Regions:
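Bacterial N-terminal signal peptides that target proteins for export
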Residues: 1-10
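Bacterial signal peptide processing site
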Residues: 22-25
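A short, Gly/Thr-enriched small/hydrophobic beta-strand-prone motif that recurs across taxa
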Residues: 27-46, 144-159
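Short, low-hydrophobicity acidic/polar segments
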Residues: 56-150
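Short helix-loop boundary/capping segments
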Residues: 151-204
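C-terminal motif of bacterial Sec signal peptides marking the signal peptidase cleavage site
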Residues: 17-20
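Hydrophobic beta-strand residues in large extracellular and virion-surface proteins
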Residues: 37-39, 58, 85, 154, ...
C-alpha cells in the first residue's frame, strides 16, 4: 500500500513539471509590431563645384526629421502600411509644403506677362520613394538625391563698336517653372525669370 502511494505522488510531480513549460515567440527586432527606417542620402549626382547641403529633411507619414550627417536614423516606429518617403534640403528662396516646392516671387519690368520668380534660388535636391512597411522589420533606405536647380549662363558678344555703346542689357527668360511637385515630377504654370547681365571687360 505504501509503495502505491509513492508512485502516485511521483506521477503528480511529473504532471506539474510538464505543465510549467512555456513556448516563447522570437522576434527579429525590438519592435515586433512596427517597422523602422534609416535613410542614407546619396549626393553623388550633384553638379561640379556644388557642396553637399549642410542639412536635409526626411518626411514619411506623420514623421519629419532633420539631419546633418550622411545617414538619418530615428527612434520613430511606423505601423504596417504604405508610405511616401520624401527627402529634400532647405534652400534659399524655396519653400516646401508636402512634396511641392515653390520658388519665391520676384518683380519684373515687362507688362502683360506671367509672374516672375526669383532668379537665384539655392541649390535644391529631392528624392521620393514609396515604402511598404511590415512589422518587425528594419529598413535601410538610400535616397539618390536629384538636383532640381540648374545654372544658366548666357554670353552676349556685340560686334563692331556696339560694345562701347551698350550701357545696359535687360532681358528675361520665359517658361520657367515656379512650382514643382517632386513626388510626381509635375511642374506648375510657366513663370518669368529676370536675367541679370554683367559687362565683362577683356584686357589684352
Amino acid at each position: 500500500m505504501k509503495a502505491r502511494q509513492y508512485i502516485n505522488m511521483m506521477g503528480m510531480a511529473a504532471a506539474v513539471l510538464l505543465s510549467s513549460c512555456v513556448k516563447d515567440t522570437l522576434y527579429d527586432t525590438p519592435h515586433p509590431d512596427y517597422g523602422k527606417i534609416a535613410v542614407t542620402a546619396d549626393w553623388s549626382a550633384r553638379g561640379e563645384g556644388i557642396d553637399i547641403p549642410a542639412t536635409w529633411t526626411v518626411t514619411m507619414g506623420d514623421y519629419t526629421g532633420t539631419e546633418t550627417s550622411a545617414t538619418h536614423t530615428s527612434d520613430h516606429l511606423f505601423a504596417p502600411g504604405s508610405y511616401t518617403l520624401a527627402v529634400w534640403n532647405p534652400a534659399e528662396e524655396i519653400t516646401v509644403n508636402g512634396t511641392t516646392a515653390t520658388i519665391a516671387t520676384a518683380t519684373g519690368n515687362r507688362a502683360g506677362t506671367d509672374a516672375f520668380v526669383n532668379n537665384a534660388p539655392g541649390w535644391f535636391f529631392t528624392y521620393t520613394e514609396q515604402v511598404s512597411i511590415e512589422k518587425d522589420k528594419d529598413y535601410p533606405l538610400t535616397a539618390a538625391m536629384k538636383q532640381q536647380v540648374r545654372e544658366l549662363t548666357l554670353v552676349v558678344e556685340p560686334t563692331g563698336d556696339a560694345a562701347g555703346r551698350i550701357t545696359e542689357i535687360v532681358a528675361h527668360l520665359t517658361g520657367a517653372a515656379g512650382t514643382l511637385d517632386f513626388a510626381t515630377d509635375t511642374y506648375g504654370a510657366a513663370s518669368n525669370v529676370v536675367l541679370p547681365f554683367t559687362k565683362i571687360t577683356e584686357i589684352g
